[in-house]
């Protein structure tokens, strides 16, 4: 049985009835309706969407650091914001070009995945093979243990 709850939720969030929503979002809703199916009424299905990162050519190391500071601070999930912004304030200015590229790749992952990997919660989100031997992720995991027992807060921009 095909479920349309995603499109109903999408339409409802914009205050539109589902029939009217397809008129305004004709390319999104039919795709969303076909994105998954369920065997029984009430089956929960998780839909994960990952957007391909923008290729940045000719970016200097300083430009990359500035972008990574922003991306570390403005994730959209408070837990990940606090973790990554503190990590970036502590380590970003000392990273090599190779480490910056690895950190950049890590930031292209989904927010909750980064959080669960950093906190070593493999039950919620298993760590992919790609990140098994990552130096940056190991550093982030060590940082997330908060051995100094400090209260995490968003660091000032002057700390970067």
Swiss-Prot record:
One of its GO terms (biological process) is mitochondrial electron transport, succinate to ubiquinone. It is found in: Mitochondrion matrix. Keywords: Chaperone, Mitochondrion. This is Succinate dehydrogenase assembly factor 2, mitochondrial. Gene3D superfamilies: Flavinator of succinate dehydrogenase. Its main location: mitochondrion. It holds the Pfam family Sdh5. Plays an essential role in the assembly of succinate dehydrogenase (SDH), an enzyme complex (also referred to as respiratory complex II) that is a component of both the tricarboxylic acid (TCA) cycle and the mitochondrial electron transport chain, and which couples the oxidation of succinate to fumarate with the reduction of ubiquinone (coenzyme Q) to ubiquinol. Required for flavinylation (covalent attachment of FAD) of the flavoprotein subunit of the SDH catalytic dimer. GO terms for cellular component: mitochondrial matrix; mitochondrion. Belongs to the SDHAF2 family. Coiled coil: none annotated. This protein may be expected to contain an N-terminal transit peptide but none has been predicted. The keyword Hydrolase does not apply. Interacts with the flavoprotein subunit within the SDH catalytic dimer. InterPro entries: SDH (IPR005631), SDH_sf (IPR036714), SDHAF2 (IPR028882). HAMAP family: SDHAF2 (MF_03057). Signal peptide: none annotated.
């Amino acid at each position: 049985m095909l479920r349309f709850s995603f499109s109903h939720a999408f339409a409802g969030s914009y205050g539109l009835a589902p029939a009217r929503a397809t008129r305004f979002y004709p390319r999104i809703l039919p795709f969303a309706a076909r994105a998954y199916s369920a065997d029984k009424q009430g089956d929960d299905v998780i839909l994960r969407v990952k957007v391909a990162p923008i290729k940045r050519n000719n970016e200097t190391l300083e430009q990359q650091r500035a972008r990574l500071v922003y991306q570390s601070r403005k994730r959209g999930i408070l837990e990940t914001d606090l973790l990554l912004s503190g990590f970036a304030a502590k380590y970003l200015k000392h990273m090599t070009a190779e480490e910056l590229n690895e950190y950049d790749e890590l930031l292209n992952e989904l927010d909750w995945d980064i959080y669960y990997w950093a906190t070593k919660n493999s039950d919620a989100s298993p760590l992919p093979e790609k990140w098994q031997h990552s130096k940056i992720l190991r550093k982030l995991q060590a940082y997330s243990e908060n051995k100094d027992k400090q209260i995490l807060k968003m660091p000032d921009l002057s700390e970067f």
